[in-house]
Amino acid sequence: MKVMASVKRICRNCKVIKRHGVVRVICTDPRHKQRQG
């Protein structure tokens, strides 16, 4: 899980979602998981 100021999609499998007011990226590749902090 990377905590980034700006979250972006890295590959086409990445999805940007908002969960409890926190922007997250979920992906099939676990290295692409990000959270806005």
UniProtKB/Swiss-Prot annotation:
GO cellular component entries: cytoplasm; ribonucleoprotein complex; ribosome
GO biological process terms held by the UniProt record: translation
Taxonomic superkingdom: Bacteria
Residue runs in coiled coils: none
Gene Ontology molecular functions: structural constituent of ribosome
PROSITE patterns named among the record's database cross-references: RIBOSOMAL_L36
Record's keyword terms, sorted: Ribonucleoprotein, Ribosomal protein
Entry similarity comment: Belongs to the bacterial ribosomal protein bL36 family.
Name assigned to this protein: Large ribosomal subunit protein bL36
Natural source organism: Bordetella avium (strain 197N)
Gene: rpmJ
